[in-house]
Amino acid sequence: MAEKNKARCAVKRLLFSTSPWLAARLGIKFEMSTADRHFLEDQLFSYINEQCGHEGNILFIGIDRYNWHYPRLIQGKFHSIDLNPRNKRYGNGKTHTTGSATELTRYYPNNRFDVVIANGLIGFGIDTLEDFGALLYGCHAILKTQGLLI
């Protein structure tokens, strides 16, 4: 069973490396099967889609292989930011920014987003009180007045 899963994952990675567009069309996912990810993908994304529809501007902070399918789960305009330049391939190429979560106001104007999703950053890049404060300050600045921070 483990060998079959490894082989399946290797095929998905190869397909993605060859053609991210085709991998997206085929619905390829590299998901993490954890309770928090299921809650985010099922409950929170459904709520965001109900509230924002296709017109909402959503920023996802920290994009990688395991959440590469998120732009396909969000109805609104999906934006992503990640510090690692290699992770650009996992975001929407047109709306991805390579940059720091502690410098959001450097990349985005005030009152830009309906939703900012900053899930799983503490201890994985946001490691100090100063970084946490900068993240919150930036999120507050770029969120619309009635915006939602997750």
Model-inferred region functions:
Residues 2-53:
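Class I SAM-dependent methyltransferase Rossmann-like catalytic core
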Residues 53, 125-126, 143-145:
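Helix-to-beta-strand junctions that scaffold the AdoMet/dcAdoMet cofactor pocket
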Residues 53-65:
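Conserved class I S-adenosyl-L-methionine
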Residues 62-76:
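Conserved SAM-binding loop of SAM-dependent methyltransferases across substrates and taxa
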Residues 102-117:
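A short acidic, Gly/Pro-enriched loop at the edge of an enzyme's catalytic core
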Residues 114-129:
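A short SAM/SAH-binding and catalytic strip from SAM-dependent methyltransferases
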Residues 130-148:
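A short glycine-rich, Lys/Arg-flanked "PGG" loop and its adjoining helix->strand segment in the class I
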